[in-house]
Amino acid sequence: VTQQRGSDPARNASRVAGEPDRLRVVLIQSSTRTGRFGPTVADWFARQLRRRDLQVDRLDLATAGLPDQLAGHDEPAPIAVRQFGDRLAAADAFVVVTPEYNRSFPAALKNAIDWFDTEWAAKPVTVVGYGTDCDGGHAATQLRQIFGELNAVPIRRTLTITKAWQRFAPNGSWPRRDPDLEAATTATVDQLLWWATALRTARTTTPFIP
């Protein structure tokens, strides 16, 4: 388990200069399998976030290089873990894009979560789940419990997308309009940003007590 990382120099420079400090959202792409559909869903949701003038930092577990075996408490973290953790620590909110496998989420995602601790704390998280006959709801429910244990704040709204392969074109665009999902997407982003703003203010004014 790693400790809280240092502050982000770019963010500090922005504050010193008095420039607006945009919220930073880390989007975690959790599928690592060959031929995965996850990048299509992640591309689409990243565009929804950027339309709200957010900084979006995408972390792909397929290329992150996180070791499968966790280090001991007294062992130094590998460089890939330190780099990943720095980006988590700089985030104001998290979005986890995940498929549902056998009523749960990929093992690579659990491994990524378990490498870290304080990096998640006092920050909101939502889940964008997808599948074929399933919609990612079981994965989202389990992730809410896990992130709550890590002192993150799982928000009420999540997105679950069934038959995702039929909803998206290969480039991530919509093959057809889906007013219900579009409305749910807007509401989810609205709620995530409310919590991100509120919790960033809280973290700035009052040290978090784990």
What are these regions (language model features)?
Residues V1-F116, W174-T186, D190-W194, L199-P210:
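N-terminal beta1-alpha1-beta2 submodule of the flavodoxin-like/Rossmannoid cofactor-binding fold
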Residues A121-F168, P179-A184:
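Short, glycine-/small-residue-rich phosphate/pyrophosphate-handling segment
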